[in-house]
Structures are given as structure tokens and as C-alpha cells.
């Protein structure tokens, strides 16, 4: 394992017992439970028929895969060149860019009112494709940076585990929705509450585990890179899906799927490939990248929700326009004795004493 042009080994060591402490194990267990609960809840919003439709007409899935494995690795490679990163820094960022979509994309797609069926199909297809695409992309883009064979470092077992975590609870949720739909509201509400509580626990344990070690990667160029990478994914994923004329719901879904990477796989590759004295504090770069993913994703959700409140629905706009047009046309019609030409002029009728109105006038 050799990286070109590394000026000197990092004077850096991980916290004592890192990865084997009680807090580390507790964090891992809570993360798995939270992911299972999230996937179960998301499965309750899906339908087999709609999943089948996306598989039979995979236009959205193909666009998403092109965005995931075309845009993100290229963005990571170009950002490394633009900011003149060292080779070890560029390699750490490239590994993140070549990773498949993560589970956070499913949760944020729900918040963005995207197509949940497409989101789960995309996450599954992205993970399956990563078994072949990840080694290929790392081989192509790491030329001249890394002398070793990165394809042997791809955590195939981790990818398969992530697929199981997605598919099994989602399938249970779909079956519950079709067979026991009255349970779905309770699962969704309970899932949201428990997920929020677990998120608080995850945040607290992460701070305890990492401590101030993450401060070592908060250099200006790494901060800029880790902020621009997810932004590039969100933006280019939306633009690419718009070019292929997908509906707004699918555009938002592909945007989220492209911008969110599987950070756990990035950390695994860095941990397996490089010893601490080589990778140094860049071991924590995936965590910094995840922070920017979450922050930018939440900002996009806030902007989208505000836009929804300001802009009236299209149907309501049409109804208002038609009503206003009718009111403007009514006075002119009444002057001619008709309204829209459907009501004939009023004919003289008999008065109570048997005389018509003309005779009464005489």
C-alpha cells in the first residue's frame, strides 16, 4: 500500500480503544435498529404495483444510476484537482464519491414528497451495481494516486448487509400496508417518535466517541470539498432528471439519491486500506462529509417546504382564473337578457287577474 507524493506520515493516533469501546458498540447497535425502523416505516408508504412499474419502465432508475456513478466520482476527482489536494486527501474524497447511495436518501426523499417506490428501487439497484461499479471506478480514477489494488478493498460483505437492512424491513412494511393497512398510521407515527429519540442518542454517542478528533480535518480546502460534493450531487441529479423530462416527484427523488452516499462504506474502505499513520485524521473525513450532507439536505427541505406554502397549487390557480373570467362575462350577458346564451329572454306571463303585462300597461 503506497500513496504517491505524501509529504510525511501524519502525527496522529485514533482515540485509545477506538472501535472497541462500549460506546462504539452501543452506537453501532442503535444505528442498525434505527435503520431497520426507518426502512420499516418507509416500506409502509410503498406498493408492489408501483415498484413493478419502475422496474418494467426503468427510465428513472437508469437516470439515477448514471447520476450516481457518473456525476459523483467525476465531481470528487475534479474537486481534488481544483483545490490541489494531496494524493491521500484526493483518494479519501474519491472513495466517498464512488460509494453507492445511502439510506439517508430514502428518509429525505420522504420529507421532500418524492417517489418512495422509486427511492427504494434506486437504493437497491445502486447497492447491487456498486459490487461491480465501485471497483471499476476506483481503479480508473485512482491511477497515479495509489499503487495498490483498491478493488480488493471494496467491502462486498458490507454492501450485502446494507441491502438486507433495506430490503427485509421494507418488504415487511409493504406487506403490512396491503394486508393490515389499519396498523400503518401507528407504525409511521411511532417510527417517527422513536427515530427522533434514537437520533438524539446517536448524536450524543458520536460526540463522545469522536471527541475533538474531527477538528483535524476541518481545514479550508477539505471543508470546501466536503460541502461542494453533496451540493453537486443534489443539483446535477435534479438537472439530469429534468433533461430526461421526469416528473417533479422523480426529480426530487433522484436529487436526494445522488447527493447522499453510503458513508459507512467509505469509512470501512479507509479503515481496511490504510493504517492510521498513513490516513491520519482523514479517517474522519466521511463523518465531516456526512455532516454537510445532512445540513444541505435539511436546507433543501426547508426551501422546498417554504416554496410549497408560497406557491398555490396549479389546480387552484386554474379554478380561480375560471371563476374570475365567469364573473367578468356575466354583466354583459345579462344586458342582452341571457347568461352564457343558455337562459332565454323572460316572456310576458299572465298576471293574477288573467291579463298579461302588456294589457295591464294599457
From Swiss-Prot:
Positions with biased composition (Polar residues): 353-362
Ribosomal protein is among the record's keywords: no
GO biological process, one term: bile acid and bile salt transport
Modified residues (Phosphothreonine): 330
Organism superkingdom: Eukaryota
Cytoplasmic side, ranges: 45-47, 113-115, 180-183, 244-247, 312-362
Pfam families found in the cross-reference section: SBF (PF01758)
Keywords: Cell membrane, Glycoprotein, Ion transport, Lipid transport, Membrane, Phosphoprotein, Sodium, Sodium transport, Symport, Transmembrane, Transmembrane helix, Transport
Tissues in which the protein is found: Highly expressed in liver and low expression in kidney.
Region named Disordered: 333-362
InterPro entries documented for this protein: BilAc:Na_symport/Acr3, Bilac:Na_transpt, Na+/solute_symporter_sf
Glycosylation sites per record: 5, 11
Extracellular side of membrane: 1-22, 84-86, 143-156, 218-219, 274-280
Activity regulation (UniProt): The transport of bile acids is sodium-dependent.
Membrane topology, as annotated: Multi-pass membrane protein
GO cellular component terms, semicolon-separated: basolateral plasma membrane; membrane; plasma membrane
Function: As a major transporter of conjugated bile salts from plasma into the hepatocyte, it plays a key role in the enterohepatic circulation of bile salts necessary for the solubilization and absorption of dietary fat and fat-soluble vitamins. It is strictly dependent on the extracellular presence of sodium. It exhibits broad substrate specificity and transports various bile acids, such as taurocholate, cholate, as well as non-bile acid organic compounds, such as estrone sulfate.
Record-linked NCBIfam families: bass (TIGR00841)
Protein name as it appears in the record: Hepatic sodium/bile acid cotransporter
Organism: Rattus norvegicus (Rat)
Amino acid at each position: 500500500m503506497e500513496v504517491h507524493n505524501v509529504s510525511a506520515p501524519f502525527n496522529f493516533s485514533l482515540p485509545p480503544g477506538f472501535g472497541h469501546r462500549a460506546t462504539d458498540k452501543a452506537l453501532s447497535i442503535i444505528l442498525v435498529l434505527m435503520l431497520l425502523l426507518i426502512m420499516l416505516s418507509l416500506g409502509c408508504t410503498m406498493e408492489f404495483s408501483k415498484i413493478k412499474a419502475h422496474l418494467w419502465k426503468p427510465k428513472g432508475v437508469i437516470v439515477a444510476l448514471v447520476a450516481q456513478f457518473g456525476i459523483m466520482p467525476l465531481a470528487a476527482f475534479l474537486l481534488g484537482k481544483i483545490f490541489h489536494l494531496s494524493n491521500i486527501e484526493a483518494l479519501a474524497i474519491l472513495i466517498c464519491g464512488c460509494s453507492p447511495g445511502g439510506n439517508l436518501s430514502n428518509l429525505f426523499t420522504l420529507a421532500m414528497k418524492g417517489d418512495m417506490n422509486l427511492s427504494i428501487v434506486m437504493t437497491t439497484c445502486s447497492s447491487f451495481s456498486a459490487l461491480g461499479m465501485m471497483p471499476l471506478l476506483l481503479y480508473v480514477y485512482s491511477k497515479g494516486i495509489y499503487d495498490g489494488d483498491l478493488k480488493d478493498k471494496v467491502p462486498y460483505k458490507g454492501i450485502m448487509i446494507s441491502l438486507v437492512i433495506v430490503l427485509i424491513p421494507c418488504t415487511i412494511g409493504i406487506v403490512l400496508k396491503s394486508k393490515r393497512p389499519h396498523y400503518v398510521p401507528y407504525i409511521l407515527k411511532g417510527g417517527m417518535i422513536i427515530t427522533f429519540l434514537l437520533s438524539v442518542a446517536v448524536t450524543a454517542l458520536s460526540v463522545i466517541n469522536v471527541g475533538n478528533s474531527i477538528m483535524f480535518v476541518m481545514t479550508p480546502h477539505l471543508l470546501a470539498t466536503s460541502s461542494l460534493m453533496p451540493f453537486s450531487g443534489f443539483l446535477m441529479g435534479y438537472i439530469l432528471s429534468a433533461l430526461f423530462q421526469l416528473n417533479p416527484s422523480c426529480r426530487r427523488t433522484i436529487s436526494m439519491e445522488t447527493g447522499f452516499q453510503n458513508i459507512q462504506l467509505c469509512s470501512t474502505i479507509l479503515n481496511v486500506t490504510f493504517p492510521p499513520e498513513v490516513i491520519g485524521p482523514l479517517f474522519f473525513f466521511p463523518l465531516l462529509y456526512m455532516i454537510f450532507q445532512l445540513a444541505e439536505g435539511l436546507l433543501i427541505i426547508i426551501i422546498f417546504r417554504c416554496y410549497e406554502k408560497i406557491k398555490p397549487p396549479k389546480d387552484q390557480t386554474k379554478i380561480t382564473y375560471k371563476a374570475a373570467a365567469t364573473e367578468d362575462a356575466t354583466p354583459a350577458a345579462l344586458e342582452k337578457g341571457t347568461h352564457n346564451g343558455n337562459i332565454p329572454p323572460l316572456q310576458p306571463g299572465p298576471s293574477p287577474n288573467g291579463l298579461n303585462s302588456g294589457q295591464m300597461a294599457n
